[in-house]
Amino acid sequence: MISIILMGCHSYVLDDAQFDLRHSFTEADYQHSEELLKKFKKKNIYRSKDQVLYNLESGMIYHFSNKFDSSSYYFTNAENEIDQNYTKSVSRGIGAFLTNDNKLVYDGEPYEDLYLNAFKALNFMPLQDWEAALVETRRMTYKMEQLDIKIKGLASAFAKSDSSGKADWKTDDINIQNSALAHYLSTILYAKAGDFDDARIEREKLEIALKEQSTLTPYRNSNTSNFEILQKPSSYNVLLAGFTGRAPYKVQEDARVFIDDYDDEKDKEFY
């Protein structure tokens, strides 16, 4: 019981540390973010189970600090940790049930596994390492294909087990594997590398991805009439990439569970 209480206390310490870290990040005070990371690491706030989280946070902070080599180093560590933590053990799941999800080894969300490759590609672009950046966009495409298979497989399984018949489990119009961001970056990178035919192919895939994406969001279709300019790197000097908003915010819900293990017959046998 003491160990459970201690693990629970640590989870709240980590939550507080994350709040401070993200506040400094929101204020664009990346130097302070770096200092906080080092302090939290020294205090062992990021335990072994939190290494994916630590590496993702580090990768983002160093990216926006223009320390691209350091950023890619931490993103690579995060990607390796995610691969290693793919399978969760039953014992960790039981531990999380008794305390909270912070007991689990954090293996990242699918979107985090994808975006780390996007930011690695962006890290290589200022260094003009187009081939290395293309490796990362190809990794994004591969992961999206695998995620598409996984999600559609889950939808099919749920459809078979759904006895109510009220939910719509059809996935015919959903193409998760078609990433507009990956095709956008690939179009630019192939053009920069002088591979104009592949740049054209990626630009066409980008237009298709945006049309498909419009069926999943309330936003109107993007105007793709000017996208051909992406295939002509000599006609532009500055690439603007903006990321707004934040990921879905997870809120912990505490619940008390009463387990009545009293057995009247065994009690009588005892006496």
Over which residues does each language-model region extend?
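Bacterial Sec signal peptide processing site at the extreme N-terminus
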Residues: 9-29
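Residue signature of alpha-solenoid helical repeat architecture, marking inter-repeat boundaries
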Residues: 11, 47-49, 110-111, 170, ...
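Extracytoplasmic/secretory-pathway proteins
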Residues: 157-271
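Residue-level signature for tetratricopeptide repeat
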Residues: 23, 61-62, 123, 189
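Boundary/linker segments of alpha-helical solenoid repeat arrays
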Residues: 45-51, 81-93, 144-155, 207-227
